[in-house]
Design a protein with these regions (language model features):
Chain A
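HotDog/MaoC-like acyl-thioester-processing domains
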Residues: 1-18, 101-185, 288-290, 295-362
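Hot-dog-fold acyl-thioester-processing enzymes
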Residues: 1-92, 142, 153-275, 333-351, ...
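Short, structured motif recognition centered on aromatic/hydrophobic residues
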Residues: 38, 92, 107-111, 131, ...
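Short, low-complexity cationic-aromatic patches
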Residues: 65-66, 98-103, 250-251, 285-288
Length: 362, 362, 362
C-alpha cells in the first residue's frame, strides 16, 4: 500500500514545550550577494554597514553584515520550528547585536520557548520565544525575543524532529561589538550625511519625506533568501484561502527594514552601530504595491563615549499616506496602537524603539 | 548605400550539423551574487550548497555552486547557438555533476549535436544535443543531454560563427566529485532537517505542502543573469505574437529549480550531493503569477557508502493546485504525460527523476 | 513645543553655486552582489566585464566593475545633492572610465557645478555639473558631465550640509586603464561572439532583434541599490501627484544600460573596454512593463593598437516597437530628437554615442 505523506512544519500551541530549545535546521553562509539583495531593497544611509572604509575607520575588520539582515535571518530561520503555522507576529523585544558578523560567516539559529498561553477566547494561543543567531564559532551575533499568535492543538503531519541538543546562554551579553569598545576615531572622510548626535533633541519629530513602494518579486525574493518558510509570503494559493488579506502578505521583518531604511538619511547617516530595538509591533499588514513611509520621534539622547553618543528613536511606519499628512490631520502617531482606547492609526504597519550609536561633531 | 543588418541567433533544423560541436560564446565568472540571486528564488534545504561549514564537513573546499545553477547556466549558454529559435524544450536526460564548481570559477559551455530529425508533419524538427559546462581549468562540472523542437529551414540573418575548435570527451565521467569519494564524516552540527536516507521507502509518496508564486521580475532577472537569450522569457512584444501563451513564459530550467526546491525540506534536508537527473520533461508552460507545487515518489533506495546512501525520486511539479488535492481527485500524477493514453494531468509543468546522496542516521 | 522637521534633499536653482563642489555622502563598497544584480537585468556580451579569465587575458588583475554600473552609481550618488528635486535629466556628455574599478573597492562621488541658468519661461532652470567617482585610493574610475532641469528657488527644508572640503582635478585624464595600454594579447579562448572590429563599416545600421521588458521590482531594486534617492523611481504616492507619467518612472541610467546591453551581442561581443559615451539624451520616459529595443549606427572606426581598434556607434533605444519596424515605416531614427523640426520619433527613450575598443581578427 502506498504511504502518502504531507509533511507540515511549524508548531501549534500544544507542540511547544516551555523551556525547550529548538535548533533551527537552516545552516547558511552569508555572502556579498545577500548583502546586495538586502541593499537593493533597503537604502540604508548608515555608513558602517555599506562601506569597508567606514567600517575599518571605526575598528571593524570589514564591512559587517547589517544587523537588520541578522534579525531577519533569525526570525526567518525560526519559522520552520516556531511560526510556520502562526496566525500573526505580535511583538519584538530586546533585540541586540552584541558582535559583528561578516560576509563569509556561516549562521545558525535556535529558539528557547520562554512561555506560552491560550488567549481568552480559547481558540488560539500566544507563544513567547527567545531566538539567538550564532556564527560558525558559536559567537552570538543577534538575540531577540518575539511573540506569535498560533492555533490551538498540534500539527498532525509534523515529522519527528532531529535531536536539538543545543543550549542558549541565560542572558545575552552587551549591545556593542568589542571592536567598537574604545574611543571613536574621527571619520574616514570629508562630507557625509548631516545628522550627527548633536543635531537631535529629545522630543524632536521627523517626518521622512520619501516613500518606498514594495515590489511583488522583491519581497518574495527576500523571504525566500532569508529561508522564511511561511506560505503567507510566497504562496498565493495558500494565501487566497488562509490569509487575512486573501493574498500574499509581506514578511514583517522586511516591513521593519524598509521603515528603518526610509528614516536613515535623517537619523542614521552619522550612525556607527545599532544598539538595539525594543517594544516593536505590527499593527497591520502590508501587501505588494503598498508604499511605506516612516516618521521618528527622539525619546532619549545620551553621551556614550568619546566621539559618539546614543540617540533613541521611536519609529513608526505607515502605508500609502505620508506621515506629515497624517500629523496634519491630527493623527496620534507615536502612541502604541495596542491598548489605544481611541485614535487608532489604521495606516500604521510597524512601530518600534531603536537606539543608535551616532558620531558627534563636538 | 546603407547596409542594414538584423542579426538573429540560434539555429533552425538545417543549420545543425550532426557531430558538430558549438562552443557557446558566453564566458562568465560565477560569483556570490549569482548564488544569492539563485537562493532568493529557490529555497533549497540541501545543506552542502548553502553552508561553507556543511560543505567542508563532507570534504569540499568551499560551498559549491548549486548543481541546479550549473544546469541552468548550461542550458542558457547554449540558447545562443542551439535553441534561440526553438519552439519548445522537450526533454532533459543524463544530467550529471561530476565535479564541484566553486564561486570564482569561470564557466563556458559547448554542445555536441547528437542527432536531428524532422517530425512527421514535416513543418518542424527535433534536435538532440549534449551540453557540457567546464571551468577555467577545463574541468567538467555539468553534463546533460536535451532535445528541442525547432522550425525547419535556416536562420537567414545569422552572422557567420567564430571558429568552434573545441572537442568534447566521448562520455562524461562519474556522478560524484572526487572530494566526496571516501566515507562520509559525521555531520558538522546538532539538529538539522529530519529526512535522512533511513526515512524513505520505495513507493512512498510525499506531497510538499508549501507552494511558490513566481514573480514577474524575478524570473526575468534569472533568465538574464543566466545568459538565456531566448526572447520568449523577457520580450513581451515578441511574446505577444510568437509565444504559445501570447505572453512571456518562464524558462523551464527555472521551473525545474522551483519544483526541486519546493520538495527539498522533505527530501533533501540531509542531502550531500545531486547524483543526477534523468527523463525530464515539461508537459506545459508556466507564466509569472502561477504558483508551483511539488510531489515526490520514492522509486529506488540504495546503500552507497559509509554514512550515506542514495535515494531516487520521481518528482512532479504542478501549477495552481496543490498535489494533495490532485491526488484526492484521483489524478495519475507520476506516470509520464508523454504517451499517456488518458488521464493527462493538465496542471503538470515538469516531471523528472532525481537521485540524491543522503546522510544515513544508522 | 514639539519641533517637527521634514528634511528634503537635492537642490533647486538658487541652491546651486557655480564653482562649488559637493561631496556626495554615499560611501559604498562595490561587491559581487552588485555585479550580479546588474548582470541580472543587463545581459551584456562584452567579455571583459563578465569573466575573470577574459579580463586577465587583457592585463586586468580581475574582472572589473562594469563601466555602466560606475556611471549609474555616479549619477545616483549625486541625486542627494544635485537632482533629487529635478524635473528631468537632460543630457550626458564626456563620460569616461579612465581606470578599472574592482569588486571590493569602496566608492565615493563628488559634483562640480559648471554652470546654471534659468530657462526662458523663467519657471525653472538648467544646472550643469561634472561628477567624478573615485575609489578608496582616490583613483578616478568614472567622470561625466550631465545637465538637469530643476525648479526655481530654494529647498526650504534642506538640512545644512556637512563640510564639502573636496577638490576635483580640472580635466579628467585619458579613456583607457593603464593595464590596457600595451598591445592586446590574443584572446584566451576558442569561439566567442562574432562581431570583431573588422566586421563594422562606417554607415552600417544594425537593428538588434531581441527586446527586454522591464520588471517593476527589478528597476526599483536597482535604483535602491545604486543609492538613487529620487522618489520618482520608487515612491508611487509621490509619483501619482508629481510624476509627468502619474506613476513611477524608470531611472534613465538604467534605460541606458538596457539599451547598451540589448545591442551588445551584435556590437560588443569582441569588446575590451568602453572608451566613452557622449551626447546622450532621454527624449522620453520609460515605465515598468515597457519593452525596450536598441538600434546602432556605425559612425567611426579607427585603428587603435595592435590587436584592437575602436568603433564609435550612435545608439538609439526605443520602447514597445522593434526598431526594424520603425525603419520600415521610414522613421528618422538616428537624428537627435532635440532640435528636430519634424519627424520626431515618439518611441525613442535614449540616444547616445558610444566608443568601444574591440578585438581585431586581422
Amino acid at each position: 500500500m502506498v504511504r502518502v505523506r504531507s509533511p507540515r512544519y511549524g508548531r501549534k500551541l500544544d507542540d511547544f514545550t516551555v523551556g525547550a530549545v529548538y535548533a533551527h535546521p537552516w545552516d547558511v553562509t552569508v555572502d556579498e550577494g545577500m548583502l546586495a539583495l538586502f541593499a537593493a531593497s533597503f537604502q540604508d544611509a548608515l555608513p558602517t554597514y555599506a562601506s569597508r572604509v567606514a567600517a575599518r575607520s571605526v575598528g571593524l575588520r570589514d564591512r559587517p553584515v547589517s544587523p537588520l539582515l541578522l534579525l531577519n535571518l533569525g526570525i526567518s530561520f525560526s519559522v520552520h520550528d516556531v511560526s510556520e503555522q502562526a496566525i500573526a507576529h505580535l511583538a519584538y523585544t530586546d533585540v541586540r547585536f552584541p558582535a559583528a558578523c561578516y560576509p563569509g560567516d556561516t549562521l545558525r539559529a535556535s529558539s528557547l520557548v520562554i512561555g506560552k498561553k491560550p488567549v481568552s477566547t480559547g481558540d488560539k494561543g500566544v507563544v513567547h520565544v527567545r531566538t539567538q543567531v550564532v556564527n560558525q564559532d558559536g559567537l552570538l551575533v543577534c538575540s531577540f525575543e518575539r511573540k506569535a499568535l498560533v492555533p490551538p492543538g498540534r500539527v498532525a503531519e509534523r515529522p519527528e524532529d532531529a535531536p536539538h541538543a543545543v543550549a542558549q546562554p541565560d542572558a545575552p551579553p552587551g549591545r556593542l561589538p568589542k571592536e567598537l569598545d574604545g574611543p571613536l576615531p574621527p571619520p574616514a572622510r570629508q562630507g557625509g550625511f548631516a545628522c550627527a548626535w548633536d543635531d537631535f533633541e529629545v522630543g524632536d519629530v521627523i517626518t521622512h519625506e520619501v516613500g518606498r513602494t514594495i515590489g511583488d518579486s522583491e519581497h518574495m525574493q527576500l523571504a525566500t533568501l532569508l529561508r522564511n518558510s511561511h506560505p503567507l509570503h510566497v504562496d498565493e494559493q495558500y494565501s487566497r484561502s488562509s490569509s487575512f488579506a486573501k493574498t500574499r502578505v509581506v514578511h514583517g521583518g522586511l516591513v521593519l527594514s524598509w521603515v528603518l531604511a526610509l528614516s536613515s538619511r535623517d537619523t542614521a547617516g552619522c550612525g556607527v552601530w545599532d544598539l538595539g530595538l525594543d517594544e516593536g509591533a505590527h499593527p497591520s499588514g502590508v501587501l505588494a504595491g503598498d508604499t511605506l513611509f516612516a516618521a521618528s520621534k527622539v525619546i532619549a539622547r545620551e553621551e556614550a563615549k568619546s566621539g559618539a553618543g546614543s540617540v533613541t528613536f521611536r519609529l513608526v511606519g505607515v502605508k500609502n499616506t505620508p506621515p506629515r499628512a497624517l500629523l496634519d490631520q491630527g493623527a496620534d502617531l507615536f502612541t502604541p496602537e495596542l491598548g489605544k482606547a481611541e485614535g487608532r492609526v489604521k495606516e500604521k504597519v510597524v512601530e518600534i524603539t531603536r537606539t543608535l550609536l551616532l558620531r558627534r561633531r563636538s
